[in-house]
UniProtKB/Swiss-Prot annotation:
Residue ranges of coiled coil: none
Pfam families named among the record's database cross-references: GalP_UDP_tr_C (PF02744), GalP_UDP_transf (PF01087)
Protein name: Galactose-1-phosphate uridylyltransferase
Enzyme nomenclature, EC number: 2.7.7.12
Pathway recorded for this protein: Carbohydrate metabolism; galactose metabolism
Record keywords, A-Z: Carbohydrate metabolism, Galactose metabolism, Iron, Metal-binding, Nucleotidyltransferase, Transferase, Zinc
PANTHER family with a match to the protein in the record: GALACTOSE-1-PHOSPHATE URIDYLYLTRANSFERASE
Enzyme class: transferase
Amino-acid positions noted as binding Zn(2+) in the UniProt annotation, renumbered to this chain: C32, C35, H90, H141
Protein's organism: Thermotoga maritima (strain ATCC 43589 / DSM 3109 / JCM 10099 / NBRC 100826 / MSB8)
The gene coding this protein: galT
Reactions performed catalytically: alpha-D-galactose 1-phosphate + UDP-alpha-D-glucose = alpha-D-glucose 1-phosphate + UDP-alpha-D-galactose
Length: 318
């Protein structure tokens, strides 16, 4: 079964996809489906993207034969789910990859965003990586994913609504104002075009955001120099995590950009990246439990300024 079901209690869509139950879980290198010679990639490759074998959304989803019954609504789960394999090296990750390889990865993200946005049914393109079994990564081989949604996910609607409200009241993008107001205490790493910081409003311990200093709303607006610097910042932030905690530090990396084939919100929506780590120190997990899940009221046990200091003072080689 694969379909969308509407929740009238929260005004959001839920994706029902039984196919995701079949995904492999933490296979060894010899059984890895995305190593060279594996099930998905039998030929040599550098980096590659392909449609997920176990998708939540499909370009040609099965039809939904359903008549609306009271509050119960269903729709076809039309969309795209892609896997992005960063490298053929099973034993590396963003912190250890050559900078040139990450630059090529950024170009691939841009290309896939451009191509997927051409589909009329695509409303939102979400690029992400789950690193580590602590956040549910099913494959240890370095990879991420891209979901092209046929609707605006709820948190995206909330972000757009909040940024719109701020812009209407202040006549300024909220992230642009954050960039103008930030000092040194929450800074993690800075370049000419980007600032990586633990935000004043961090929800997770050691949460890091990456903000372009220039107001851009999607990856498609990045200049050549910005794309190169973006690759560098991604490498530095992830390397700082690994070195500070002396381990392959788990995280959820998420790219937030403006919607496509929807209302133009580019004047107030500022592209940004969020790293949400599931750990509150080297050996302890920060559980997203009842309060966070049920109310979206997050309790952060690590003071953002202290987390930023630790990450800022962790020196890494690029």
């Amino acid at each position: 079964m694969m379909e969308l079901r509407y929740n009238p209690l929260t005004d959001e869509w839920v994706i029902v996809s039984a196919a995701t139950q079949k995904r492999p879980v933490q296979p060894s290198k010899t059984e890895c489906p995305i190593c060279v010679g594996g099930l998905e990639l039998p030929e040599e490759y550098d980096l590659v993207t392909f449609e997920n074998r176990y998708p939540s959304l499909k370009k040609d989803p099965p039809p939904v034969n359903w008549k609306e019954k009271g509050p119960f609504r269903k729709e076809e789960s039309r969309g795209v789910c892609e896997v992005v394999v960063y490298t053929s090296d099973h034993n590396t990750a963003l912190p250890g990859m050559p900078l040139k390889q990450i630059e090529k990865l950024v170009e691939m993200w841009v290309d896939r965003t451009r191509d997927l946005s051409q589909h009329d049914f695509v409303k939102y393109i979400f690029i992400f990586e789950n690193r580590g079994k602590e956040v549910g990564a099913s494959l240890p081989h370095p990879h991420g994913q891209i979901y092209a949604f046929p609707f605006l996910p709820k948190r995206i609607e909330v972000k757009i609504g909040a940024m719109r409200k701020w812009y209407e009241e202040k006549r300024k993008c909220p992230i642009c104002e954050v960039l103008e107001s930030e000092g040194e205490e929450r800074k993690v790493y800075e370049t000419e075009h980007f600032l990586a910081l633990v935000p004043f409003y961090a929800r997770f311990p050691y949460e890091v955001h990456i903000y372009p200093k220039r107001h851009v709303s999607t990856l498609l607006e990045f200049s050549k120099e910005e794309k190169k610097e973006f690759a560098k910042v991604l490498k530095v932030v992830t390397a700082k995590y690994d070195k500070l905690f002396d381990q392959e530090f788990p995280y959820m990396m998420m790219f937030f950009q403006a919607p496509f084939n929807e209302e133009d919100v580019s004047h107030f929506f500022h592209f940004h990246v969020e790293f949400n780590p599931p750990k509150r120190d080297r050996d302890k997990l920060k559980w997203m439990a009842s309060v966070e899940t049920g109310t979206w009221a997050f309790i952060n046990p690590v003071v953002p300024e202290e987390a930023a200091r630790q990450l800022r003072e962790t020196e890494v080689e690029i």
